[in-house]
Amino acid sequence: KNIIPDMREAGEKLVAYRFDGYWKDVGTIDSLWEANMDLINPNIPIDLYDTSWKIYSRNPVMPPQSIGKNAQVQNSMVTEGCVIDGSVEFSMISDGVTVEEGAEILDSILMPGAVVKKGAKVEYAIVGENTVIGENAQIGARPETIEDKDSWGVAVAVSYTHLRAHE
């Protein structure tokens, strides 16, 4: 957050670079969520298929995605190794994610290896790596369903956890 001011104060050499493309500081949970949603927003001029724009990332070798016959995927990105049998809308689905039949993913980011069990619902959330959202569990909520708007924020399920339905 204070890298540039701290470098300036320490007398470090700073160099400016003119940049005209898309850039977003993802230093908060909300801004990380927004940046991912920008990738699927048709009103944001980002062309992921522009071969002159290099994307540097770790890509594990996995089979292609599998979209089940009853699955619904709308305005989302689903990467390799995913098995989608539920409903995915306006979401970013990382490699190796499983969305079981009857599960709903809305306006969310699922990190690599996440599993969403049948009947579970994920809304306005970031689900960490290798996290399991249990059968009929729910995480997150649409902002319009929250009475106290000041308390609403993107929900987070940290990596390597298992969320169960409230009994």
Task: Give the residues covered by each predicted segment.
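Left-handed beta-helix
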Residues: 1-164
